């Protein structure tokens, strides 16, 4: 009986410790999610703003049958500057920010969560994931972010290829599309987007994480220097965008159909039209050379900013 009396307080003490431990763990998890969201949002905003003029020029070529060349691209940039002013090179960037900030925040925080879940499942808690789960985590993160923010991507594309008179601001785009074309138009081009995001996000995160893992193994340093992170991110962007680029062209055509003279069509029909009218390589890879300039810069800035912000926030929390 005496043992029962002793066991009661002991069990109560153990239960209290378990509840307290669970509460601390839950708060830590919430802080990690908020930290990832904030770091991802800043990373996306900085990266996209840095390459916004090149991004707008790329979209203009993607949605037209005009042949791409570096000379023509810089001519478009120059005439846009002359006719509409310097800040017009960032036209549509406000719509880009409205999309990119939540997109990047969701993508990076989802990637951290998927890494944790897959790492726990495969028994790699606290360590680098093996190759296939690493690729899978990136693909899942990109798909999650694209699914939740797609209408904002369509709005950004519309603003990039139309004159100011057609759409005055982001809300005007939403109102006109909803009224004149129907709400379902806001998800026109969604399937090629997801099909493109899977290899793009999967390969980007996979390449970046793999290069960081190899760096730790061969350099003996736990953390790369910022310029090394930029190089790893640039390589990740180059590989990811090259793999998914044809689907990027298809989604832009589908998103801007109705305002660029092209009829609305399915993925297969859009692909056939591009190949028939412009050729497989010229049509589906139009503007890729510009992406090889802007993509590595944007992805390098994005991954580096996210990592450095995570390190800073962890330091402040500790």
Curated annotation (Swiss-Prot):
PROSITE patterns named in the record: SOLCAR
Keyword flag Iron: no
Localization (cell): Mitochondrion inner membrane
Reactions that this protein is recorded to catalyse: ADP(out) + CoA(in) = ADP(in) + CoA(out); 3'-dephospho-CoA(in) + ADP(out) = 3'-dephospho-CoA(out) + ADP(in); adenosine 3',5'-bisphosphate(in) + ADP(out) = adenosine 3',5'-bisphosphate(out) + ADP(in); AMP(in) + ADP(out) = AMP(out) + ADP(in)
One BP annotation, GO: ATP transport
Record has Methyltransferase as a keyword: no
SUPFAM superfamilies referenced in this protein's UniProt entry, alphabetically: Mitochondrial carrier
Sorted UniProt keywords: Disease variant, Membrane, Mitochondrion, Mitochondrion inner membrane, Repeat, Transmembrane, Transmembrane helix, Transport
Main subcellular localisation: mitochondrion
Transmembrane segments: 33-53, 89-109, 135-155, 186-206, 230-250, 293-313
Topological type in the membrane: Multi-pass membrane protein
Clinical condition linked: Metabolic crises, recurrent, with variable encephalomyopathic features and neurologic regression: An autosomal recessive disease characterized by muscle weakness, developmental delay, lactic acidosis, and encephalopathy. The severity of the clinical manifestations is highly variable even within affected individuals of the same family, ranging from asymptomatic lactic acidosis to severe developmental regression, epilepsy, intellectual disability, metabolic crisis, and multiorgan involvement.
Role according to the record: Mitochondrial carrier mediating the transport of coenzyme A (CoA) in mitochondria in exchange for intramitochondrial (deoxy)adenine nucleotides and adenosine 3',5'-diphosphate.
Protein name: Mitochondrial coenzyme A transporter SLC25A42
Source species of the chain: Homo sapiens (Human)
């Amino acid at each position: 009986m005496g043992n029962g009396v002793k066991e009661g307080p002991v069990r109560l003490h153990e239960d209290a410790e378990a509840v307290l431990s669970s509460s601390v763990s839950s708060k830590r998890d919430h802080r990690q999610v908020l930290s990832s969201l904030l770091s991802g949002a800043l990373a996306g905003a900085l990266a996209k703003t840095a390459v916004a003029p090149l991004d707008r020029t790329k979209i203009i070529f993607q949605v037209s049958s005009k042949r791409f060349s570096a000379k023509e691209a810089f001519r478009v940039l120059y005439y846009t500057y002359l006719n509409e002013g310097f800040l017009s090179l960032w036209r549509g960037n406000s719509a880009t920010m409205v999309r990119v900030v939540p997109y990047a925040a969701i993508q990076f925080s989802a990637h951290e969560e998927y890494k944790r879940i897959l790492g726990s499942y495969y028994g790699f808690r606290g360590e680098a994931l093996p190759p296939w789960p690493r690729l899978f985590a990136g693909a899942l993160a990109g798909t999650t972010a694209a699914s939740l923010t797609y209408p904002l991507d369509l709005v950004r594309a519309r603003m990039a290829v139309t004159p100011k008179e057609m759409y005055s601001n982001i809300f005007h785009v939403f109102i006109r599309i909803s009224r004149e074309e129907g709400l379902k138009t806001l998800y026109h081009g969604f399937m090629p987007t997801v099909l493109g995001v899977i290899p793009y996000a999967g390969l980007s995160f996979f390449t970046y994480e793999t290069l960081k893992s190899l760096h730790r193994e061969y350099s003996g340093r736990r953390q790369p220097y910022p310029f090394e992170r930029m190089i790893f991110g640039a390589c990740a962007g180059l590989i990811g965008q090259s793999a998914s680029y044809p689907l990027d062209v298809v989604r832009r055509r589908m998103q801007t159909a109705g305002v660029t003279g092209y009829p609305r069509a399915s993925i297969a029909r859009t692909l056939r039209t591009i190949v028939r009218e412009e050729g497989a390589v010229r049509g589906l890879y139009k503007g890729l050379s510009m992406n090889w300039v802007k993509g590595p810069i944007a992805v390098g800035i994005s991954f580096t900013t996210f990592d450095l912000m995570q390190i800073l926030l962890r330091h402040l929390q500790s």
